[in-house]
Amino acid sequence: MVKTWDEFLEQEAKQPYFIELMKAVSEAREEGNVYPSEEDMFSCFRLCPYDKVKVVILGQDPYHGPGQAHGLSFSVQKDVRIPPSLRNIYKELKSDLDIDPANHGYLAKWAEQGVLLMNTSWSVEEGKAGSHKKLGWATFTDHVLEELNNYDKPLVFILWGNHAIKAASGITNPKHLLIKGVHPSPLAASRGFFGSKPFSKTNEFLKENNRTPIDWDLNSK
């Protein structure tokens, strides 16, 4: 088991698949726009250190529009329009914990409290959803989740949609809580995402395990 994300990345950097993956991403950046930026690609690790993780929210692909993705799943930069899936997440947060929707989509405050907001693909070409999913990110994500499965404290995995549920199939440690549900996208949210109460369920589990609950309110300081 690693002790920091830096240690984890150093370990991966020696592996042939990762060397090939970084080469492919680098070549794609030379040919066009790739999101998020190189410095933000692993920002979920920077904002949520390994020893602070409490919750994992697993997304699929970074946003592929200019200025949106900054390395946290579902999150966008502060001055960018809130995407539809995140609007639905805010609606459920209001219904679940009576927290008013934020006027921005920047989720760094969650990350800083121990919410690891990670995607299964960590880069994407502009305007091409899923364009990097076959570059080797699945192996990288599997290795991240393997580390988290062996984590020494109980974690909550919030898995929205079949893609996330399937990606986290290796999370088998009984001390963790898996909250599986429908994706918050406008196409699916009304089929069971609304009313699923993932935020209160997460905090109840954390309290039961003597871990500080998450303050989900993005409006408070």
Curated annotation (Swiss-Prot):
Its job: Excises uracil residues from the DNA which can arise as a result of misincorporation of dUMP residues by DNA polymerase or due to deamination of cytosine.
InterPro entries the record matches: UDG_fam1, Ura-DNA_Glyclase_AS, Uracil-DNA_glycosylase-like, Uracil-DNA_glycosylase-like_sf
GO molecular function: uracil DNA N-glycosylase activity
Main subcellular location: cytoplasm
Family in the record: Belongs to the uracil-DNA glycosylase (UDG) superfamily. UNG family.
EC number: 3.2.2.27
Active-site residues, as the UniProt record annotates them: D61 (proton acceptor)
Gene: ung1
Reaction(s) catalysed (UniProt annotation): Hydrolyzes single-stranded DNA or mismatched double-stranded DNA and polynucleotides, releasing free uracil
Recorded GO CC terms: cytoplasm
Top-rank taxon, per record: Bacteria
The protein's name: Uracil-DNA glycosylase 1
